[in-house]
Curated annotation (Swiss-Prot):
Keywords: ANK repeat, Repeat. The keyword Repeat applies. Signal peptide: none annotated. InterPro entries: Ankyrin_rpt, Ankyrin_rpt-contain_sf. ANK repeats lie at residues 70-95, 96-126, 127-156, 157-186. The keyword Repeat applies. Pfam families: Ank_2. This is Putative ankyrin repeat protein L148. It comes from the Viruses.
């Protein structure tokens, strides 16, 4: 197919195809070689190779341009969409992952990626359960449940996960954290104070009800309520 027309004509056709040209690039090595005429690797081409799990083309691009940034981008994007197969092919045997890659997975609820790096030795509880705090802030409930199932502490870093979820109005996340040990009373009911400050009334009502269950209405009204009213 490639030999039917001169390269110059194919270049015109590829320009005409716009974003669809990336699929044509990956038909075979001849078409891919046209993309290599560019001095800088096109990130959209990297994305297409990952989405189609075209490992051969991805390795060719990385080898040709010989830029570590391309591999970094490929790994980051793969973590974001959960393409564990690409990740396995791109990393050495002793590679256990980085917080940046886990962050990409958490942002997109890709627990299969997190599980993969955990199986290679990545510490999911690194830096006082930083990943759980991040999941709470990003409202990645699926990931939060996964991390807690692996031993993450909902009271980590002075109850930070609940505080971050409350500040950002993530009601289901707040409920999950409280049900799994987060302290409603920590730091003088800081989570309630912040939820109220940002207008998350459903969270305020829920946390107040939970606090009353723990300390009783009298103590709640006399001691806790004045702290944030």
């Amino acid at each position: 197919m490639f030999d039917v027309l001169p390269v110059e004509i194919w270049i015109i056709i590829l320009d005409y195809l716009k974003s669809d040209k990336y699929n044509l690039y990956l038909v075979n090595k001849q078409f891919l070689s046209i993309s290599l005429m560019n001095k800088v690797c096109d990130n959209e081409l990297i994305i297409t190779t990952i989405k189609t799990t075209n490992i051969l083309a991805l390795k060719l691009l990385i080898d040709y341009y010989n830029q570590e940034s391309i591999l970094d981008y490929a790994l980051y994007f793969s973590c974001g969409i959960g393409n564990v197969r690409i990740i396995k092919e791109m990393i050495p045997d002793n590679y256990i992952g980085t917080e940046k890659l886990i962050f990409a997975a958490i942002q997109n609820d890709q627990d299969s990626v997190i599980d993969f790096f955990a199986s290679r030795g990545f510490d999911l509880r690194i830096n006082n359960d930083y990943l759980l705090r991040l999941a709470a802030e990003m409202n990645s409930l699926k990931t939060a449940k996964y991390l807690v199932s692996k031993g993450a502490n909902c009271q980590a870093y002075n109850n930070a996960p609940l505080q971050k979820a409350s500040i950002n109005g993530h009601f289901e996340m707040v409920k999950f954290l409280v049900e799994n040990g987060a302290s409603v009373a920590a730091k003088k009911s800081y989570a309630i104070k912040k939820a109220k400050l940002y207008g998350h009334n459903n969270i305020v009502e829920y946390l107040e009800a939970k606090l009353i269950e723990i300390v009783g209405e009298k103590i709640f009204l006399e001691y806790f309520k004045p702290k944030y009213s």
